[in-house]
């Protein structure tokens, strides 16, 4: 079987985990006129990529995938707890928890998940997105690096979808912005590979403040 199919499946917006229900603070950034056009949108996304994802979220996701791929359940549990403790707002915690639950329901109904991984998933009370993503990659025999690339692409695609609904940003403008951001996506993956999870960290105050404000936003398109 062509391995690219499994990778496309994991990165597909058709994966039923609800990722396109959330904006990760971007809707509030538009509401507060921090993001007003393609240029400011590009700055917001590039800052998130290089100052947050590349330094913390992506290394942690990669650590999940490496532990799951190797069947190192103790290490997977450890990084899973680190991920859970790092959610800075209620909104971000619930987002990760809901998407993790959706992945759990999906994996429970699939024959590809092996017995050890299924047992680990059953013993996990509240699986979050990174954990579910790592187990899905194991089930579909996707390498940790490819699973990280799929996750980064899904994140970027979701941010662009948010912009098309809120800014609004046209499809052609979104594609031009994608071309500008793809090198940064690659840079984020490389940085994540070099980052030890023991030293990983970021101070994404803008994201946290936007997320907290979004929890109280009067009118919104995306979930909180």
Swiss-Prot record:
Entry-linked InterPro entries: UreF, UreF_sf
Localisation per UniProt entry: Cytoplasm
Alphabetized GO MF terms: nickel cation binding
Signal peptide segment: none
Annotated Gene Ontology cellular component terms: cytoplasm
Source superkingdom: Bacteria
Keyword terms: Chaperone, Cytoplasm, Nickel insertion
Pfam families the UniProt entry points to: UreF (PF01730)
Keyword Mitochondrion in annotation: no
Described purpose of this protein according to its UniProt entry: Required for maturation of urease via the functional incorporation of the urease nickel metallocenter.
Family from the record: Belongs to the UreF family.
Oligomeric and partner information: UreD, UreF and UreG form a complex that acts as a GTP-hydrolysis-dependent molecular chaperone, activating the urease apoprotein by helping to assemble the nickel containing metallocenter of UreC. The UreE protein probably delivers the nickel.
Protein name per the record: Urease accessory protein UreF
Protein's organism: Pseudomonas savastanoi pv. phaseolicola (strain 1448A / Race 6)
């Amino acid at each position: 079987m062509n391995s690219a199919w499994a990778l496309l499946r994991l990165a597909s917006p058709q994966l039923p985990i609800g990722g396109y229900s959330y904006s990760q603070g971007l809707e509030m950034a538009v509401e507060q006129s921090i993001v007003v056009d393609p240029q400011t949108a590009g700055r917001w996304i590039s800052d998130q990529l290089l100052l947050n994802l590349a330094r913390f979220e992506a290394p942690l996701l990669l650590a999940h995938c490496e532990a799951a791929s190797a069947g190192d359940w103790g290490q997977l549990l450890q990084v899973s707890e680190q991920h859970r403790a790092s959610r800075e707002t209620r909104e971000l915690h619930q987002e990760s928890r809901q998407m993790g639950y959706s992945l759990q329901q999906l994996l429970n109904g699939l024959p590809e998940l092996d017995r050890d991984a299924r047992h680990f998933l059953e013993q996990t009370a509240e699986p979050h997105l990174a954990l579910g993503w790592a187990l899905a990659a194991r089930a579909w025999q996707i390498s940790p690096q490819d699973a990280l690339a799929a996750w980064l692409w899904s994140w970027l695609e979701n941010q662009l979808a948010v912009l098309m609904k809120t800014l609004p940003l046209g499809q052609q403008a979104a594609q031009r912005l994608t071309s500008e951001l793809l090198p940064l996506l690659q840079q984020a993956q490389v940085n994540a590979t070099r980052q030890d999870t023991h030293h990983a960290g970021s101070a994404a105050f803008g994201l946290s403040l936007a997320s907290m404000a979004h929890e109280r936003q009067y009118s919104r398109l995306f979930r909180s």
